[in-house]
């Protein structure tokens, strides 16, 4: 009855009146009558069935259609019953009356419409006319055209001489009238006003058309100039012969009244009128009235520090100065930016106070300069030596004099923005090195996110676990604690071995300045108890030491191997299906031949005549290895007809027709060419892995296939969730490749396992000792866990004695060299059995024959983003039901098998999600949002994601981009953001690299970014750890690990990229060569975008500033109690023991990443000055008010000095009240 009432209410209306109540009663009476009829004829009295019959009768008003609908739904009613029901329903259920109200019917809002109202910033209109990057051919054509124009253009020197001659003739003949001068001035003013109005009208347009606007403005200005003016030949000439310089020339040479006030950025002649200890006053010439300005002591000379102003200038001396800023009649000047002989501007990009700067001034700058920030103007480039130097302190009388001058309005406070009213300290005059600066987070939200950030909304972390209190979640937490215990036990063993060294020898190790022989003996003694070889005993036994041979062995030829694959029998049907459909979903088991054969079949069918065949892979290693295999089968060299492209490595040529690439590289190609015009077919392989890039490609390619009817899209998956892919891609047909499957027996545990690692090893030993022949596959979460399991299992098997059959233990994880990974494909020798202990890479990416037994603990390690803390973490979580089925299927490929699930059946049913959470819903999306914005996609809510990411993650990503300067106050991409999108790096690294161009250290930053992109630069052999540490310490820099990496690369470069040098210094030569390749790629990108690559020499402060500009979110301050505390969330972190700063413990640092092992460790740490945080991230940090308690100080606990007569907390006010 309740269902009937609810349905009646939904059908009739939401606001019940007398008529509505009567209609509800009529509907209930009808339901009751239909139930009676059904009970009389069929013996069924079901209200739900009665309501269903009523709904069918309302949709089908005639007898024939009503009968047909009933038969279609499986009803076996007689004609008499059908006619009675239809007559009864039509009689008792009157038709709905049309609405008499004049108000329009309000439809209920969909979920997406509600989200659009809540988050308007996420649904801004897209910008289809987004600028795309030019390829190398376009750049070459443009350069050739500019060279031709340059050849036709008269020289600049000739134009200057011609102007000077005309000016001299005009001056001598005195034929120019004042009325004509006034008219020309008026025309120029009108022209400027028109330009300003034009800018105001176009200010709200899309930022992607900024380059076109600038070009049109400059063209219009050139058309309005004299007939003798030639068009500019390039962007530099545009600035050189721009309107601003033309006005300056007229100001100097045309006879007209001088201006009343100076212009910011212009250069004037002047005379020194007075000298102070902090600078000198200069009277400007060429103005109508007397105008004086201050040249600060730091603005006098570029070369070195000035101790005494009188050493540089004298009273009455004539100088050339540049106007930096002025407030009222008080002006700030600079001499160091002007050549005192020629008057040339040595630093034209510098601005000091932009408040008075007109929009026309800024419009003349190069729009592609990457120094534009929507939040903060880029910090000025100071003189060559940027290190902070202690200057002479200002005397008390001088301080008093400055205060009196400010109080008398002779000097303005605005000229000294950092002036401290209490102490009278001027900026950069007497900075205190040991000043304790308090930095706080800016509480203000970005304008376009007001009310939506974590400051005003409760942002919860993404839930990737179905039941956080279930047995699987508890087992995952228990395993983390057990792993920590095992690490600590190993550490204690090592320390015990160290303590066993005789004290007489150990003193040479403790002594900071020992003799060489004693140090060597101590180093050797420290190796006691260590493994004498790099390879542990279990690993030597597994891989056969140095005598092992790697590679999958087979007697079949390449053609026979191809014909043995399951997909070969379906070759013709597959090619025909691709021909008949624009989008095709291909489902096939791992090892069926999808990845290697489909591209070749389509190439043989002639699809390469229309373009390339592109195939994406979720992993770099897969793209490289598959391309190598296909090139062998195709009969060509790798890089010719078949090639691959991964980040920082392009192994293709103009002849390439089959191209394998990572999904991220195809996404970058979409950034350049949204329609992918050079491809005829795109194949998204391993789509079931649902990486971030794959999910974004789904939405982009959906649009592309609608624009390009000639393009084919193939989506392949190894799992059985094909229906979801088909529904997403316009109900695309599904092509299934039948695999070799056998029945698999599923076995569950009766009780939950607390230590799944130990349970896995016990299960493996039971299988080995009791079950028939057949190899075993065990799924664990990561490298550390797998190595531990292999070591424990080897020791346990060894303890059973020689009579037990041999068990070959083989680990598999991504960090293992590929040649060692191939050992798992070799069959076990007769009388023995192999056990493969692998990560989830063996679920779908690897096909291992001979597996009959699968041990599944039910866990996987996933990267999860916490939007509250803004940190990505690797977390051990329960797998999904789809993953559990996939793992069990591994046991049924060779023959009937068994799957041992180390969890209960109830846990499988109640604690596991149906499918795993896509990566796009659990990771940081800053890079993804930046790429989408660069493609002109601003409406993120309407973007067709297969599974939409959480709103909290999108908002956090936009907030991060805003603080980096990539988004403006409206949430749209800035020029800096567009530049950042063109680098294949994380946004923070992009910002760091681009800012280094402005700071003049881009050559060093290129090297640092390249070294950060590779892993394991140093290595420590266990038998030579002391020597390796000693060699590494030679490269340590006091500034931090980033500059240590720079020192390593530069030393390698100075030693002519020598491999023996790397071996001698315990440095991975392969990692350095990889960094060198990455550096070349990044250098090419910077050259393509005309970004200067300059060196800072010994001025490493520039490098530190550049690092701070990108990684300011990762700032941490030393905590008085222990370690460091991050500024964002006050999390306790520690400097990693391998860091160059481990023994220095500086006050302020920024780190590259956090690593969770026994503690939260900071990796790649660099010291910073806290002032830089405010300088480079004013939208994120601010200097706390010294008159108020900051949040950090409020959290600190006051600990009194020891008093033997009182309790420690007796001094507190709360205790004093209690005593009363």
Swiss-Prot record:
InterPro entries: DEAD-box_helicase_OB_fold, DEAD/DEAH_box_helicase_dom, DHX8/Prp22_DEXHc, DHX8_GH2-like, DNA/RNA_helicase_DEAH_CS, HA2_WH, Helicase-assoc_dom, Helicase_ATP-bd. Keywords: ATP-binding, Helicase, Hydrolase, Isopeptide bond, mRNA processing, mRNA splicing, Nucleotide-binding, Nucleus, Phosphoprotein, Spliceosome, Ubl conjugation. The modification Phosphoserine is found at residues 395, 460. SUPFAM superfamilies: Nucleic acid-binding proteins, P-loop containing nucleoside triphosphate hydrolases. Residues 265-336 form the S1 motif domain. ATP binds at residues 588-595. A motif (DEAH box) lies at residues 685-688. It comes from the Eukaryota. It is found in: Nucleus. One of its GO terms (molecular function) is ATP-dependent activity, acting on RNA. Expressed in skin, cervix and nerve. Also expressed in the brain. One of its GO terms (biological process) is mRNA splicing, via spliceosome. Residues 160-169, 180-196, 232-259, 362-371 have a biased composition (Basic and acidic residues). Belongs to the DEAD box helicase family. DEAH subfamily. DDX8/PRP22 sub-subfamily. The RS domain confers a nuclear localization signal, and appears to facilitate the interaction with the spliceosome. Involved in pre-mRNA splicing as component of the spliceosome. Facilitates nuclear export of spliced mRNA by releasing the RNA from the spliceosome. This is ATP-dependent RNA helicase DHX8. It comes from Homo sapiens.
């Amino acid at each position: 009855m309740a269902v009937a009432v609810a349905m009646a209410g939904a059908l009739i209306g939401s606001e019940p009146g007398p008529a509505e109540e009567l209609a509800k009663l009529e509907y209930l009476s009808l339901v009751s009558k239909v139930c009676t009829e059904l009970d009389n004829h069929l013996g069924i009295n079901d209200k739900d069935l009665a309501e269903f019959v009523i709904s069918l009768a309302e949709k089908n008003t005639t007898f024939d259609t009503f009968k047909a609908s009933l038969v279609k739904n499986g009803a076996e009613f007689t004609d008499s019953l059908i006619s009675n029901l239809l007559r009864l329903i039509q009689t008792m259920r009157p038709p709905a009356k049309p609405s008499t109200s004049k108000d329009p019917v309000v439809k209920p809002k969909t979920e997406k419409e509600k989200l659009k109202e809540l988050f308007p910033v996420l649904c801004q209109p897209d910008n289809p006319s987004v600028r795309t990057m030019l390829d190398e051919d376009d750049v070459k054509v443009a350069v050739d055209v500019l060279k031709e124009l340059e050849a036709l253009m008269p020289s600049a020197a000739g134009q200057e001489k011609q102007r000077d001659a005309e000016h001299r003739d005009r001056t001598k003949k005195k034929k120019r009238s004042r009325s004509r001068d006034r008219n020309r001035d008026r025309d120029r003013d009108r022209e400027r006003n028109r330009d300003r109005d034009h800018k105001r009208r176009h200010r709200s347009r899309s930022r992607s058309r900024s380059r076109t606007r600038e070009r049109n403005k400059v063209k219009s200005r050139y058309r309005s100039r004299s007939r003798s003016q030639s068009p500019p030949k390039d962007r530099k000439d545009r600035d050189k012969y721009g309107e601003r310089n033309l006005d300056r020339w007229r100001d100097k040479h045309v006879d007209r009244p001088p201006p009343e006030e100076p212009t910011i950025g212009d250069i004037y002649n002047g005379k020194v009128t007075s000298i102070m200890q902090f600078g000198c006053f200069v009277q400007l010439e060429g103005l109508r009235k007397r105008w004086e300005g201050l040249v600060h002591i730091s603005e006098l000379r570029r070369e070195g520090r000035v101790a005494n102003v009188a050493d540089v200038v004298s009273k009455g001396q004539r100088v050339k100065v540049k106007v930096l800023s002025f407030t009222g009649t008080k002006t700030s000047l600079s001499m160091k930016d002007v050549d005192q002989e020629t008057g040339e501007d040595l630093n034209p990009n510098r601005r000091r106070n932009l408040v008075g700067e007109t929009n026309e001034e800024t419009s003349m700058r190069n729009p592609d300069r990457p120094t534009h920030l929507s939040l903060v103007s880029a910090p000025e480039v100071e003189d060559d030596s940027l290190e902070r130097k202690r200057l002479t302190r200002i005397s008390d009388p001088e301080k008093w004099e400055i205060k009196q001058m400010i109080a008398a309005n002779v000097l303005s406070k605005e000229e000294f923005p950092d002036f401290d009213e209490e102490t009278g300290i001027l900026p950069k005059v007497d900075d205190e090195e040991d000043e304790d600066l308090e930095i706080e987070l800016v509480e203000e939200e970005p304008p376009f996110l007001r009310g939506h950030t974590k400051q005003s909304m409760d942002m919860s972390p993404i839930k990737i676990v179905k039941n956080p209190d279930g047995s699987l979640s508890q087992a995952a937490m228990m395993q983390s604690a057990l792993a920590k215990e095992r690490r600590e036990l190993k550490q204690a063993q090592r320390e015990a071995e160290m303590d066993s060294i005789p004290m007489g020898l150990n003193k040479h190790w403790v002594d900071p300045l020992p003799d060489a022989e004693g140090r060597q003996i101590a180093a050797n003694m420290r190796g006691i108890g260590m493994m004498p070889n790099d390879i542990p005993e279990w690993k030597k036994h597994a891989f056969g030491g140095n005598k092992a041979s790697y590679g999958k062995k087979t007697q079949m030829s390449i053609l026979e191997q191809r014909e043995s694959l399951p997909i070969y029998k379906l070759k013709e049907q597959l090619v025909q299906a691709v021909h008949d459909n624009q989008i095709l979903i291909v489902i096939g088991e791992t090892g069926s031949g999808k990845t290697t054969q489909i591209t070749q079949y389509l190439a043989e069918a002639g699809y390469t005549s229309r373009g390339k065949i592109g195939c994406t892979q979720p992993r770099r290693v897969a793209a490289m290895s598959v391309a190598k295999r296909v090139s062998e089968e195709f009969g060509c060299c790798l890089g010719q007809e078949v090639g691959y492209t991964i980040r920082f490595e392009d192994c293709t040529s103009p002849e390439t027709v089959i191209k394998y690439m990572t999904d991220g590289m195809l996404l970058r190609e979409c950034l350049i060419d949204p329609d992918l015009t050079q491809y005829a077919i795109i194949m998204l392989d391993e789509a079931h892995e649902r990486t971030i890039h794959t999910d974004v490609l789904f939405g982009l390619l959906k649009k592309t296939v609608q624009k390009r009817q000639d393009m084919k899209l193939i989506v392949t998956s190894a799992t059985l969730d094909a229906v979801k892919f088909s529904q997403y891609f316009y109900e695309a047909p599904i092509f299934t490749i039948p695999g070799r499957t056998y029945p698999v027996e599923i076995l569950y545990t009766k009780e939950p396992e607390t230590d799944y690692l130990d349970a896995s090893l016990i299960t493996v030993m039971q299988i080995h000792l009791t079950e028939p022949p057949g190899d075993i596959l065990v799924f664990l979460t990561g490298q550390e866990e797998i190595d531990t399991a292999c070591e424990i299992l080897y020791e346990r098997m060894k303890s059973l004695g020689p009579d037990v059959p041999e068990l070959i233990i083989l680990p598999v994880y991504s960090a293992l060299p590929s040649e060692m990974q191939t050992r798992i494909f070799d069959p076990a020798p007769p009388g023995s059995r192999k056990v493969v202990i692998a990560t989830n890479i063996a679920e779908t990416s690897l096909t291992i024959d001979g597996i009959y037994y699968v041990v599944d603990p039910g866990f996987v390690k996933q990267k999860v983003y916490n939007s509250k803390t803004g940190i990505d973490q690797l977390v051990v979580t329960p797998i999904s039901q789809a993953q559990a089925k996939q793992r069990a299927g591994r046991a049924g490929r060779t023959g009937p098998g068994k799957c041992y699930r180390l969890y209960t059946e109830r846990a499988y049913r109640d604690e596991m999600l149906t499918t795993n959470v896509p990566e796009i819903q659990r990771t940081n999306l800053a890079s993804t949002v930046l790429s989408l914005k660069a493609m002109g996609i601003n409406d993120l809510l309407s973007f067709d994601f297969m599974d939409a990411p959480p709103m909290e993650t999108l908002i956090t990503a936009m907030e991060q981009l805003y603080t980096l300067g990539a988004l403006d106050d409206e949430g749209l991409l800035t020029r800096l953001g567009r530049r950042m999108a063109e680098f294949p790096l994380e946004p923070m690294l992009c910002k760091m690299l681009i800012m280094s161009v402005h700071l003049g250290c881009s050559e060093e930053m290129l090297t640092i970014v390249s070294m950060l992109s590779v892993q394991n630069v140093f290595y420590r052999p266990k038998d030579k750890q002391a020597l390796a540490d000693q060699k590494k310490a030679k490269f340590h820099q006091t500034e931090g690990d980033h500059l240590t990496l720079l020192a390593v690369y530069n030393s390698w470069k100075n030693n002519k990229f020598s491999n023996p040098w790397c071996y001698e210094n315990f440095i991975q030569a392969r990692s350095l060569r990889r960094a060198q390749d990455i550096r070349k790629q990044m250098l090419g990108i910077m050259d393509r975008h005309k970004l200067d690559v300059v060196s800072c020499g010994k001025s490493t402060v520039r490098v530190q500033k550049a690092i701070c500009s990108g990684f300011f979110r990762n700032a941490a301050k030393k905590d008085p109690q222990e370690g460091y505390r991050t500024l964002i969330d006050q999390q306790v972190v520690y400097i990693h023991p391998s860091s160059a700063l481990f023994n220095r413990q500086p006050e302020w640092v920024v780190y590259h990443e956090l690593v969770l092992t026994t503690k939260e460790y900071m990796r790649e740490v660099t010291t910073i000055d806290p002032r830089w945080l405010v300088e480079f991230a004013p939208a994120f940090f601010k200097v706390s008010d010294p008159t108020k308690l900051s949040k950090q100080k409020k959290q600190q606990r006051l600990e009194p000095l020891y008093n033997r007569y009182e309790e420690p907390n007796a001094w507190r006010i709360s205790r004093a009240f209690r005593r009363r």
